């Protein structure tokens, strides 16, 4: 029996095509994935992300615990509401999950983790928290709606209370705050401006309907995937997992090496991997016809004239650009050109940093 979010019936009302997503009944699309994608790039769209796991970490050791648990450093967070992105690593520096952590106070942090990794994450967090004076509280009674796109904030403003609107006025990216019953964050998974709104389950249907009434288009998992890939954002389980370290997943920027005496889980293994050199995650662009897909082999010749091989982790047709894009894990010596094997022949692709579209425009 699949889990259903509190918005399940709202999806059916909008004629969603429902699919199983890691044990959850979720909307794939509401008729046209392409239209939903363009709505987010050009106007405003919304996603039910209530399957995500919200965890509150509280107690006198909350800060010290998260400094041990995460490769990024929550000590960087000094302004209430500020958030950071990073990886939770195992002892071998494999990525258990990627997550966002909000700093609410020195004794209260909010962590949002992926749904597919929920049980594994909660077990790991519980185990690692044992020596610390902290309380780990999962918040299943909270739903979450992401409102994304160039007009998302303006449309959300029409459903917020005056108090909520003044609270979010001028809020910078990667912040979150509680106002009334809503936790409103300037985060997202699309490369557009907008909010991720955590809402009590009993209020979620009304909020969804109010956003629908202001012309925010409901969007499914299909558009969510093409949008995040255009933005060069990783999907856990495809672009990285426990067999991959963050340096090989374009997450090097999320590792806080300083201060050097912060002994986060996985640090020793990661230091060794960094010294050895690792593979890297790059972006691929193919302007010829065809679609780059997960697991297709990638070939290039290194500076010594030796052929090297990698593979595509995520690939799709980019509705914004009009051709195919992908992320690929490859040996570090790759240049600006490579080849992908598709339909038994090799096709030339451009190699770029993995960011294709930001704020509606080509990013490379």
Swiss-Prot record:
This is Aminomethyltransferase. The gene is gcvT. One of its GO terms (cellular component) is cytosol. Belongs to the GcvT family. Its EC number is 2.1.2.10. Pfam families: GCV_T, GCV_T_C. It comes from Shewanella denitrificans (strain OS217 / ATCC BAA-1090 / DSM 15013). NCBIfam families: gcvT (TIGR00528), PRK00389.1 (NF001567). The keyword Transferase applies. Gene3D superfamilies: Aminomethyltransferase beta-barrel domains, Aminomethyltransferase fragment, Probable tRNA modification gtpase trme, domain 1. The glycine cleavage system catalyzes the degradation of glycine. SUPFAM superfamilies: Aminomethyltransferase beta-barrel domain, Folate-binding domain. It catalyses: N(6)-[(R)-S(8)-aminomethyldihydrolipoyl]-L-lysyl-[protein] + (6S)-5,6,7,8-tetrahydrofolate = N(6)-[(R)-dihydrolipoyl]-L-lysyl-[protein] + (6R)-5,10-methylene-5,6,7,8-tetrahydrofolate + NH4(+). Keywords: Aminotransferase, Transferase. The keyword Transferase applies. InterPro entries: GCS_T (IPR006223), GCS_T_bac (IPR022903), GCST_C (IPR013977), GCV_T_N (IPR006222), GcvT/YgfZ/DmdA (IPR028896), GcvT/YgfZ_C (IPR029043), TrmE/GcvT_dom1 (IPR027266).
């Amino acid at each position: 029996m699949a889990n259903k979010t509190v918005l399940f019936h709202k999806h059916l009302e909008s004629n969603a095509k429902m699919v199983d997503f890691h044990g959850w009944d979720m909307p794939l699309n509401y008729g046209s994935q392409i239209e939903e994608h363009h709505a987010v790039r050009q106007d405003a769209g919304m996603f039910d992300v209530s399957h995500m796991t919200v965890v509150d970490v509280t107690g006198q050791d909350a800060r010290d615990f998260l400094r041990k648990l995460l490769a990024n450093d929550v000590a960087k967070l000094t302004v209430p509401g500020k958030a950071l992105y990073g990886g939770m690593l195992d002892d071998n520096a494999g990525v258990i999950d990627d997550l966002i952590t909000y700093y609410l106070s020195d004794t209260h942090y909010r962590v949002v983790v992926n749904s597919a990794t929920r049980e594994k994450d909660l077990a790991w967090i519980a185990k690692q928290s044992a020596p610390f004076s902290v309380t780990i509280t999962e918040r299943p009674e909270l739903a979450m709606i992401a409102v994304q796109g160039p007009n998302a904030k303006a449309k959300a403003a029409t459903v917020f209370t005056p108090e909520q609107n003044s609270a979010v006025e001028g809020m910078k990216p990667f912040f979150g705050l509680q106002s009334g019953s809503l936790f409103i964050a300037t985060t997202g998974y699309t490369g557009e401006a907008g909010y991720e709104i955590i809402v009590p389950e009993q209020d979620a249907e009304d909020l969804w309907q109010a956003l629908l009434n202001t012309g925010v288009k409901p969007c499914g998992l299909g558009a969510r995937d093409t949008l995040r890939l255009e933005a060069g954002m990783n999907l856990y389980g495809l672009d990285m997992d426990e067999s991959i370290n963050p340096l090989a997943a374009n997450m090097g920027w999320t590792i806080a090496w300083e201060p050097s005496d912060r002994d986060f889980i996985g640090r020793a293994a990661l230091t060794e991997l960094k010294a050895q050199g690792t593979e890297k995650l790059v972006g691929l662009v193919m302007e010829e016809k065809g679609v780059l897909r997960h697991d297709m082999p990638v070939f290039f010749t290194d500076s010594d004239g030796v052929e090297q091989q990698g593979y595509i982790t995520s690939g799709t047709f980019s509705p914004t650009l009009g051709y195919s894009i992908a992320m690929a894990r490859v040996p570090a010596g790759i240049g600006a050109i490579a080849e992908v094997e598709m339909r038994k022949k090799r096709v030339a692709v451009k190699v770029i940093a993995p960011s294709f579209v930001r704020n509606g425009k080509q990013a490379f």
